[in-house]
């Protein structure tokens, strides 16, 4: 019975984490934020009206 419980337990590998133990959701949020900043900088150079002033 103990072997069945161990086999059915969630695996550590099933958790969404990078090799540095950072949750992937946080990693994706950081990437999205960085890309948005780059897009805003590019947009500001072309069309100043689309700049975000945060």
Swiss-Prot record:
Where in the cell does this protein reside?
Secreted
Q: Which residues form the propeptide?
A: 15-40
Free-text tissue specificity from the UniProt record: Expressed by the venom duct.
Q: Which Pfam families match?
A: Chi-conotoxin (PF16981)
What GO MF terms are annotated? toxin activity
Q: Which residues carry this modification: 4-carboxyglutamate?
A: 52
State whether keyword Protein biosynthesis applies.
Answer: no
Leader sequence range is: 1-14
Q: How is it modified after translation?
A: Contains 2 disulfide bonds that can be either 'C1-C3, C2-C4' or 'C1-C4, C2-C3', since these disulfide connectivities have been observed for conotoxins with cysteine framework V (for examples, see AC P0DQQ7 and AC P81755).
Q: Which UniProt keywords apply?
A: Cleavage on pair of basic residues, Disulfide bond, Gamma-carboxyglutamic acid, Secreted, Signal, Toxin
| A GO cellular component entry from the record | extracellular region
Has UniProt tagged this entry with the keyword NADP?
no
Tell me which family the UniProt entry assigns to this protein.
Belongs to the conotoxin T superfamily.
Query: Know anything about its domains from the record?
Result: The cysteine framework is V (CC-CC).
Protein name as catalogued: Conotoxin mr5.4b
Question: What organism is the protein native to?
Answer: Conus marmoreus
């Amino acid at each position: 019975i103990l072997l069945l419980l161990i086999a059915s337990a969630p695996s550590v590998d099933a958790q969404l984490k990078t090799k540095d133990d950072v949750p992937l959701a946080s990693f994706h949020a950081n990437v999205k934020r960085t890309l948005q900043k780059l897009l805003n900088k590019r947009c500001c150079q072309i069309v100043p009206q689309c700049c975000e002033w945060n």
